Amino acid sequence: MENIALIGIDLGKNSFHIHCQDRRGKAVYRKKFTRPKLIEFLATCPATTIAMEACGGSHFMARKLEGLGHSPKLISPQFVRPFVKSNKNDFVDAEAICEAASRPSMRFVQPRTESQQAMRALHRVRESLVQDKVKTTNQMHAFLLEFGISVPRGAAVISRLSTILEDNSLPLYLSQLLLKLQQHYHYLVEQIKDLESQLKRKLDEDEVGQRLLSIPCVGTLTASTISTEIGDGKQYASSRDFAAATGLVPRQYSTGGRTTLLG
């Protein structure tokens, strides 16, 4: 195993397929492992570069491999896809990951820390609750409109519900349903506030987040999102690369000497 220079791992939930190659790019070893057996195998390998797609479980695996002395590299799946040379299977995917990682111009994803992943989970749950809150008010608007009652857009239906029920003769079961939706809305609001408080506490412990908060007009949600998704930003060669990665610049589709910028 001393001649292994690069390992590509196709990550799965319970099975992991690896493709190993030497410095010349020649395949020297490939095998399927379970999660415990993979860690056991890599713990006995000399320190080397290990490439994976940036997908579910990849950031945990990157931290684990770094603890074993290896150099983990995460690649966006869209950059791996062009290197699949034949019919798709797990070993072919692992080989394509190796091929992509060996390119000098390849761009890699920075592995997230445990704290970043935990903060990202808070953001995703909060986003889901916000969507549920909007869905709840939309349902209430729709139910009332079916009975000829029009209420201004937004959360006005929540604050005016008692008056609406008093002024209009609605079926009892519908009134009870609307009151349940109102209670659900208030529950969602409390849950969102609780998550935002947790995000603020997490951000107080984050050095990058505190620096971001010093920027005018940057608040808790923006700072925690950037800190979670971007990290310290060392993976970007310049501020222009950061702007392009976050979608703050137009998408380019130029050909034949003609420049075309898309939205």
Please identify what each model-predicted range represents.
Residues 1-263:
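A detector of single, family-specific signature residues
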